[in-house]
Amino acid sequence: MPEIDLLVREAIQNSSDASLKVDADRFDVNFTIGTFNPLKFNAELGCLKAILDKHYPEESADYLEIRDMRTTGLTGPVRLSELDREDHGNYFKLVFDTGKEQTASSSGEAGGSWGYGKSVYYRAGIGLVLFYSQIAVDDSFEERMILSLTEHETDSSSLLKEIVSDSVGRAWWGRRDDKNPKELLPITDASEIESILNIFGVGRFKQGQTGTAIIIPYINRDR
């Protein structure tokens, strides 16, 4: 199956699954291709900034946004200490569980997390994926944002290997937990979320909306 077909199928299936607990007549999934300024985005990535600036010196690059609405969004615990062993929840399963069993196959055909599953988001670009979601929490709403990088640990061109030679191919950007420095939590501050989304020219979810936006930077439109 062509990679783009797999991406569309996986995205719609994920949104369909996330719509089952929402009282609505339908759910929406929108695919949007746009451009962004690499320097502005790379500046958000700490020690990866210089490496990305070197690889992508152009003033513009392409991204893909997959956004669903009338779905539950990335619900569930955000701390390891709160996980249910039987069900990690939408947030943990998509952000942290995907890609943890890597294989030597660069085509994603060798099973594990690089098979025909959610790792398709990472394969659509260079391995960077920005997750943004708004969920219902009791009588209010909460926004969550986190960035993930997943690469093949055997890939000699890995970005992370330019920082740590024995990298296992996984990294995340979010906010540190004040209670436990070992925990990485999603960004929940509205102004910080808006600032990052502005890089891509996309907006936050409106009050009362629930759903998830997956932004994949540095895509190749010709693939």
Residue ranges, per PLM feature:
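Generic detector of short, locally flexible boundary/turn motifs and exposed helical patches
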Residues: M1, R85-D87, L94-D97, R176-K182
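Conserved ATP-binding N-box helix of the HATPase_c
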Residues: P2-P38, G117-Y122
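Phosphate/oxyanion-binding active-site loops and adjacent basic polyanion-contact surfaces
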Residues: E3-A11, G76-R79, D87-N90, P181-I193, ...
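Generic recognition of well-structured, leucine-rich alpha-helical segments
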Residues: S15-A18, G73, A124, R221
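Generic alpha-helix signal with a bias toward terminal, lower-confidence helices
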Residues: S19, F41-L45, V78
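Short helix-terminating capping/connector loops at secondary-structure junctions
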Residues: K21-R26, E58-E59, Q207-G208
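GHKL-type ATPase core
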Residues: F27, I33-L52, E109-R223
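Flexible ATP-lid and adjacent glycine-rich G1/G2 motifs of the Bergerat
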Residues: L52-D139
